[in-house]
Amino acid sequence: IMFVWASAAEVEERGSDQRDSPASLKSMETIFQSEQRECRYLMGGCSKDGDCCEHLVCRTKWPYHCVWDWTFGK
């Protein structure tokens, strides 16, 4: 998230003429895509624990979604 914020601040410093250019918009799109993870967030749908992000597990009863596994840490 800090990377996205810093990149947005850098684009802001360049001025609106460059910020609104198609190349700049494509660059920002790439930044946001890089932040997307291949796991499901809290309350995201799942079918197994591996679908969920770290410290989340797939709920074993319907409705199946990712819930906190009561662990802490990195």
Swiss-Prot record:
This is U19-theraphotoxin-Cg1a. One of its GO terms (molecular function) is ion channel inhibitor activity. Residues 8-36 form a propeptide. One of its GO terms (cellular component) is extracellular region. Disulfide bonds join 39-53, 46-58, 52-66. Keywords: Disulfide bond, Ion channel impairing toxin, Knottin, Secreted, Signal, Toxin. The presence of a 'disulfide through disulfide knot' structurally defines this protein as a knottin. It is found in: Secreted. It comes from the Eukaryota. Pfam families: Toxin_12 (PF07740). Belongs to the neurotoxin 10 (Hwtx-1) family. 38 (Jztx-33) subfamily. Expressed by the venom gland. Residues 1-7 form the signal peptide. It comes from Chilobrachys guangxiensis (Chinese earth tiger tarantula). SUPFAM superfamilies: omega toxin-like (SSF57059). InterPro entries: Huwentoxin-1. Probable ion channel inhibitor.
